Each structure stands twice: as structure tokens, then as C-alpha cells.
């Protein structure tokens, strides 16, 4: 009888502990009372991958399955556009950028397009078949000029509308899962397996390799507003580069919430708040330098993984899957 009572008590303790743990996993963070985001659904199975504007109101959204949408109201509504591309190829439009009316689109497989009239007409530029890797990131630099990076870390620059390209690195970084460009022209990338990251500065001939900070594989990496780096690792771990110029100095792991979903991107808004987005509608915000976090109520209701955040001076978007995205409206929603 004593053994039975003891076993029953142990079982009860296990059940109580399990329930309490499962409860605190998803309710550990408070939900913000308001949100600056407006949810949009574009009624498509395509995944939005990038967005760019020619001015405060006119811009384009690109994505998988050849998706290209145009807005003339700052992103409140989006209209279908099409590109003159072979029907048999299912292009993935990964990156778009504008400098005024001059714009560029990079996609896969082997796609690069250029416009000089705000996107009303696009010209396909055919790349050398010996190009290392596939186009991954395009940056409009100014009149007739752009910089292109591939998914193996090759970096090229053109000053004649894409007629010719000059290699800026002699040795690519290797296959990458994430690659970002800083405002100063530097790059940072995460290896395809997430076991190291690499940095490149203008004028360098090769990438500099850095080992990951912990045993957790890296998911993504990017630039803070001050030029220092941030990184997201598996296990929903965030770290901030805390010593300017020292790429080996990082904060301890910041784990805002353990809900079984990782983070895929981070961004800072104009007020200095930090946003982190990830799986299953995970959208968190910190307004005190990552010390405390809140769940965004609009993001939390979305049936989508948030894969990318795009912030510029006039716009901000959180890109999801299957036509889901969030648009910054600023006012409380």
C-alpha cells in the first residue's frame, strides 16, 4: 500500500510539473497591448522574399514562383506584374533594389534583370556560365552601377548597366545559407551548414572565417544600426556583438522565449526597438536593448513563419510565407 501511494504521488508530481512547464513555455512573455503592424494576405502560394521602393509610395515585392507585385500606395495594396521570362522556368526572385528609378532584380536560376524607368520595363542580363554560384543579393549603387553577391560569396561590381562585371574577391566564401551587406559595403555570411560565419571588407581579396560562438549551429547573421553584428543560432538563441571591431566578442545567449520555434531574422526600428521574427507567427519586440521582450499581437495571429524583415527610412515589412506579410503602419492596431 505504501509503495502504491508513493508511486501515485510521484506520478502526480510528474503530471503537475509537466503541465506547469508546458504552460510557461508559451506564456512566459507578455503580449504587447498594441502593434505597429498591419497584416496583409496576397492570396498566393508564393513566398515573398524581398521588397524595395523607388520612392515613398511606389515599389515592388518579389518572391518564389516568379512572383512580382507592384504598389503605388506605400505597400497598402499590391498588384500583379509579370516579367518577360521563359514559361518553362520557375524562377525564384530573391533580391530587388532601387536607386531612384534604376533598379535590379537577382534570382535563381541564373537570373539578373535591370530597369532604368522605375520597373515599367525590365531587361534580362545574361550572366557568364562560369559565374561562381547563383545570384543571391543585388545592391543598387548609383547611376548604371550595382553590386551583386552570389550564394557562394562571390562579389561583383558593374558600372555599365550590367554589361561587364569586376570581381571584388579572389576566393569565394563557400556555400552560404545567409548573406548580408552593410551600409559601408562590407558583407557577412553564414555557411550552409551553420558551423561558421565569414566577413569581408571592401579592399580585401578573401573572406575572413570566424568559428561559431557555441555548439549551436548558426541560422542567420546581420548588422546592428551601429555597424556591429547580431547573430541567431538554433535553439532560439540571440547574440549581439558587444565590442566594436572585435568579431570574437559576443554577449551571452539571449533566449527571449522557448516555444519550440527558432528565429530567422532580426531588425531595429527607427526608435531603437529590436524585432525578432521566426516560426509559427513568432514576432517579438524589445524596447530596452534585449533585456525584456513582448509578443507582438498581430504577428502572433498569423499562420506563417516569418522569414525576413526589411526596414528602410520610409517603410518596414515582415515577410512570411504563402503571400503573408506584415506592413508597418506605426499607429496602434
Swiss-Prot record:
Keywords: Lipoprotein, Membrane, Palmitate, Photosynthesis, Photosystem II, Signal, Thylakoid
Signal peptide interval: 1-23
Lipidation (S-diacylglycerol cysteine): 24
Locations listed in the record: Cellular thylakoid membrane
GO BP terms: photosynthesis
Lipidated sites in chain (N-palmitoyl cysteine): 24
UniProt main location, coarse: membrane
Any one GO CC term of the record: photosystem II
Coiled coil: none
Membrane topology according to the record: Lipid-anchor
Domain of life: Bacteria
Recorded family membership: Belongs to the Ycf48 family.
Recorded domain comment: A 7-bladed beta-propeller torus, about 55 by 55 Angstroms, with a depth of about 25 Angstroms and a central pore.
Main function: A factor required for optimal assembly of photosystem II (PSII), acting in the early stages of PSII assembly. Also plays a role in replacement of photodamaged D1 (psbA). Assists YidC in synthesis of chlorophyll-binding proteins.
Assembly and oligomerization: Part of early PSII assembly complexes which includes D1 (psbA) and PsbI; not found in mature PSII. Binds to the lumenal side of PSII complexes. Interacts with YidC.
Record's protein name: Photosystem II assembly lipoprotein Ycf48
Amino acid at each position: 500500500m505504501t509503495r502504491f501511494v508513493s508511486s501515485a504521488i510521484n506520478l502526480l508530481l510528474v503530471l503537475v510539473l509537466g503541465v506547469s512547464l508546458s504552460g510557461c513555455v508559451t506564456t512566459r512573455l507578455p503580449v504587447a497591448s498594441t502593434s505597429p503592424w498591419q497584416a496583409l494576405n496576397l492570396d498566393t502560394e508564393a513566398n515573398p522574399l524581398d521588397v524595395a521602393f523607388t520612392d515613398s509610395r511606389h515599389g515592388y515585392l518579389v518572391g518564389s514562383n516568379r512572383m512580382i507585385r507592384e504598389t503605388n500606395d506605400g505597400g497598402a495594396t499590391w498588384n500583379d506584374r509579370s516579367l518577360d521570362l521563359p514559361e518553362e522556368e520557375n524562377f525564384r526572385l530573391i533580391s530587388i533594389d532601387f536607386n531612384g528609378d534604376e533598379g535590379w532584380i537577382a534570382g535563381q536560376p541564373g537570373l539578373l534583370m535591370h530597369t532604368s524607368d522605375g520597373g515599367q520595363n525590365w531587361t534580362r542580363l545574361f550572366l557568364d556560365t562560369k559565374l561562381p554560384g547563383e545570384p543571391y543579393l543585388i545592391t543598387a549603387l548609383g547611376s548604371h552601377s550595382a553590386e551583386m553577391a552570389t550564394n557562394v560569396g562571390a562579389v561583383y561590381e558593374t558600372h555599365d548597366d550590367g554589361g561587364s562585371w569586376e570581381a571584388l574577391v579572389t576566393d569565394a566564401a563557400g556555400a552560404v545559407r545567409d548573406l548580408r551587406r552593410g551600409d559601408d559595403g562590407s558583407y557577412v555570411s553564414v555557411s550552409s551548414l551553420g558551423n561558421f560565419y565569414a566577413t569581408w571588407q571592401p579592399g580585401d581579396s578573401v573572406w575572413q572565417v570566424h568559428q561559431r560562438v557555441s555548439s549551436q549551429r548558426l541560422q542567420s547573421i546581420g548588422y546592428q544600426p551601429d555597424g556591429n553584428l547580431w547573430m541567431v543560432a538554433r535553439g532560439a538563441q540571440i547574440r549581439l556583438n558587444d565590442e566594436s571591431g572585435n568579431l570574437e566578442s559576443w554577449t551571452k545567449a539571449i533566449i527571449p522565449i522557448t516555444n519550440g520555434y527558432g528565429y530567422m531574422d532580426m531588425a531595429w526600428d527607427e526608435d531603437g526597438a529590436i524585432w525578432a521574427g521566426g516560426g509559427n507567427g513568432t514576432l517579438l519586440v524589445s524596447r530596452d536593448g534585449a533585456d525584456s521582450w513582448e509578443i507582438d499581437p498581430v504577428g502572433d495571429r498569423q499562420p506563417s513563419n516569418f522569414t525576413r524583415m526589411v526596414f528602410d527610412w520610409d517603410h518596414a515589412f515582415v515577410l512570411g510565407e504563402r503571400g503573408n506579410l506584415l506592413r508597418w503602419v506605426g499607429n496602434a492596431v
